[in-house]
Amino acid sequence: MYQELIKQELVTAQQALADFIADAENINAIERAATLIAASLRDGGKVMSCGNGGSHCDAMHFAEELTGRYREDRPGYAGIAISDPSHLSCVSNDYGYQYVFSRYLEAVGRPGDVMLGISTSGNSQNIITAIESAKAKGIKVVVLTGKDGGKMAGLADVEIRVPYFGYADRIQEIHIKVIHILIMLIEKELAV
């Protein structure tokens, strides 16, 4: 009954991934991001990740893979998802949702840390505000975006952009693959 729809969804996902892979800059950006994050962790820094909705879940997944494990046993790495419900509700109520991530970076971020922002549109104002706060504190910025990069295009030290202009779920599917590759490369960098 739905077999053709299922196949169509898988083929569309396959094409979005093929288009992403075909751009060598995407591969280079993933490598640069992993190297940047690994250098911060090696020097005692931390990675703070953030996103909204499904991207928030991806930010939590990234931090969990750092503090827990990916494929192999190894020491835990300093990864924090900006996801504490009391922080999010307090800052949203007292300052506005635009500041939920930046306020956290202002409180616990240090020069040499890294912020990972995830936004399928590249237009999430709270992540843009966090980028501004991060840069003011000497925190390096990596962003995962989609479409044309939105307002975040050009703001980060490293942008990994999925140039897909359809539904956001296709972008999220590639973001999670990128996250897993980042973790794998970070582990390799820190194993030497």
Swiss-Prot record:
GO terms for biological process: carbohydrate metabolic process; D-glycero-D-manno-heptose 7-phosphate biosynthetic process. Keywords: Carbohydrate metabolism, Cytoplasm, Isomerase, Metal-binding, Zinc. Its EC number is 5.3.1.28. PROSITE patterns: SIS. It holds the Pfam family SIS_2. CDD domains: SIS_GmhA. GO terms for molecular function: carbohydrate derivative binding; D-sedoheptulose 7-phosphate isomerase activity; zinc ion binding. Residues 37-192 form the SIS domain. Pathway: Carbohydrate biosynthesis; D-glycero-D-manno-heptose 7-phosphate biosynthesis; D-glycero-alpha-D-manno-heptose 7-phosphate and D-glycero-beta-D-manno-heptose 7-phosphate from sedoheptulose 7-phosphate: step 1/1. The keyword Zinc applies. It comes from the Bacteria. It catalyses: 2 D-sedoheptulose 7-phosphate = D-glycero-alpha-D-manno-heptose 7-phosphate + D-glycero-beta-D-manno-heptose 7-phosphate. HAMAP family: GmhA. NCBIfam families: gmhA (TIGR00441), PRK00414.1 (NF001628). Belongs to the SIS family. GmhA subfamily. This is Phosphoheptose isomerase.
